[in-house]
């Protein structure tokens, strides 16, 4: 089984919280169990030079976002016997820090779309894309809206894992139209309470929804009973 693990942060490259720990350890554990697991993440400006030196340039391509096309460079590296894909756009990611910027919505909509565009450029097709938290929540949405008609994508299944439900990617509806470029029929997928909620979109469009632990799942599903 081939798994592409999509995360906004991962050790040993960069970390701000528990997601990086999971993204740095789970793929290696899955590989030991026989899965072919790879990781995709942004190429941040804060990644240490000694780690950058181990990266290899693969290719570059454009990522369509509504009316714009944005550059994306693709690099790869290996850590803990796992292949990492790092997506480069200096405008979005060459900054001090990972989160907390005024354009975080645009940055991670770009990242989500770039993951799928990357798969059109390389000789690799995962069976499963495991998305994590709101920063990759648009992957299953984009996959179903734009990419299912492409042969390479027809068999791909998605898992969406919630690590921190407090951060859901809530923004104005203009993010869905002017940034994500979703057609009118797809707007209800990400709409919640008259705003964009990217996590809601991922829950709606993913084949499987999971949480970071059974306890976390019980905590939030029990509130819905």
Give each language-model segment a name.
Residues 1-223:
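Catalytic cores of nucleotide-sugar-dependent glycosyltransferases that transfer UDP/GDP/TDP-activated
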